[in-house]
């Protein structure tokens, strides 16, 4: 064997030995795949409620304020001075008497319902009937009813309504009872009466209806039908709304803790949450201490309802708010 062939054979043997050693070595483990991040329980899902709701503008909301001629003085002027000044195009005042001066202050959005000024079930239902018809005429997406002792936070209201679709059956508010109301439904023609149970949102805290639901209510609510429907159960206006929505249409009241009436203990509302509420109220002469506990530049004698204090915290740039509020608001 020539010397060249011997060298080649040795090289082949060496290569074979190296390959044998490599085959005996353990194979390396595959690199682990990167893990998906653990879900964050506090993170809001990408598909949030707002994607299913409306992109609302302030003028999409119709706010009806129910009042009476005797409250056209300080009570209603307080609302015009505070929250209505921030939502003038949204707000319509429904009353029972003409008042040219107040009509001018309200920008022409005060409506004389020609209903009785006496606080009876029939008079209340008369006003609600007019409110409902005016809302349908407006073409707006949402109807919200409040009383003349409510402070409305327009920003909170718009934010809340934006989480729903106005095409869906939405009835939103706060019940004053912890159980459904039970009523006797009188059948036309003097037939057998039925017992019906349903929830209703108290008008004293305010409530809202989507246009989709309001249109379905039309056979029992439009063009004066609301009053005859109320006579079937002989209940006030807010109860009749609940009767139509739940008892006749089978929709449901969505209970919201953001609406407040004078019937609850308002001092129990946490002060840190007051500015996020949709509506507030106050106790009035019969219960003057039932007001929200909010600090402000006005004392209780200057601001017995606490509405001015709340307003200056929400809108410190208001010209009549104390300078302290305006300076603090500039740095927020």
Curated annotation (Swiss-Prot):
Names of the cofactor(s): Mn(2+)
Membrane topology: Single-pass type II membrane protein
Residues bearing glycans: 114
Top enzyme category: transferase
A GO molecular function held by the record: O-fucosylpeptide 3-beta-N-acetylglucosaminyltransferase activity
Cytoplasmic side: 1-6
Residues annotated as binding substrate: 75, 148
Gene Ontology cellular component terms for the protein in this record: Golgi membrane
S-S bonds: 115-126, 144-208, 312-321
Annotated binding of Mn(2+), by residue: 149, 262
Cofactor note: Has some activity with cobalt but not with magnesium, calcium and zinc.
Biological processes, Gene Ontology terms: cell differentiation; nervous system development; pattern specification process; positive regulation of Notch signaling pathway; regulation of Notch signaling pathway
Entry's family note: Belongs to the glycosyltransferase 31 family.
Listed name of the protein: Beta-1,3-N-acetylglucosaminyltransferase radical fringe
Gene it is expressed from: Rfng
